[in-house]
Amino acid sequence: MRPHRVLCLFIALCFWMNTDRLKNLSQLAILCLKLGSTGVGGFLVVLAMMEYEVVTRKKWLTKQKFLDIIGASNLVPGPSSVEVTIHVGYLYGGWLGFVISGICLIFPAALIKTAFAWAYTQFGALPEIASFLDGVKPVVLAVMLLAVTKLGKTAINNWRLLIIGIFVCTANFFGVSEIILLLVGGAIGMLLIGFHQELSPEESGVEQSANTKFQIPKAVFFLLITIAILFFIDANYSPSLSLGKLSIFFLKVASLLYGSGYVLIAFLQGELVDDFGWLTQQQLLDAIAIAQITPGPLLSSATFIGYLLLGIPGAIVATVSIFLPSFLFSAALISVVSQLRSFRWTSAFLDAVNTSSIALMAAVIVKLSQSVLIYWQSWVILLITFMISFRWKVNVIYLILGGAIVAWILFKF
């Protein structure tokens, strides 16, 4: 499309929307661009920053609503940070906000990964910034810890949920899959809480009636058909490289990726390195390293890999393919989340899933701390950051920048 046509379309869109709607969408876009540009450290950091912005600072959502979105997003494949952001975008800006929030969150990470991939192909190595970013890790850990503390106080409001949380967190350390723990935790919650929980129409926000039925959105059936088609195509293509085959691979992975984003590494190793030979072992390790030290979810390593394999077109195709299912799953969840609060048993299930999600986040923090808190300087930075952020509502970006400077001074001297 030519530039003047794009400009005309933009002007027409501005006239079509009222001032308040345009203001909401612009605030949403700015927020998601900021999150996408600064969310270093994984999905939990992005969720912590999102909680600070939309719950504590802007008060767009209550803590309970935010927890419901996190809990539901953990039940479907894909990066929770992207799906939660998209869902929040819909609640604040409608379907246009749904699209804008997702694009603005993903675009900065994809752009940064593409720049790193270009440098990698030009110089054959990673830029030397990993050592600097190591100093930010205690700050990131403190931000994550504060978010889990705040959300946990809302989610775990009785002894039954506390038992479920302890069970899920403990089981995760013994290697039980995240999705299994979420489903088991939800089922236990239905049994322990469903008998004791009464739901009024005011609490559910939905008028109750005897003939109310739980509706399964059409998007769910569309997703199942799409996944079946992908499996059929996947079983019948050769390992020769093309944009179409690259797209099929990442669509398939994104439709099946439950739990930690690190499961992605197993898919990449098994098919791109071992089966197809599209990547070398070193290229895969470098792609994962880049994803860890730059903003965005681990799945955004697909952008880096796409560029290595097929240049700019490969980066675009890989990025769209790895994140497209998240938009579809989020669209399916939008109608489901509100319905879950409309019934006693499903509300109990969601409460338990929320608690299980918080427990899994706590387990992630403990696991990360084992590799981050190995020096006394790291402990000092963690404690200072946590106390400051707990006492005052300091923007996460300032905490990260300040922590990086303090870390540089402490580790230098």
Cite the ranges covered by each PLM segment:
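Multi-pass membrane proteins that catalyze or facilitate reactions on polyprenyl-/lipid-phosphate substrates
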Residues: P3-V76, H87-T294, L298-F413
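Conserved beta-loop-alpha segment that forms the PLP phosphate-binding cup at the N-terminus of a helix
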Residues: S80-E83
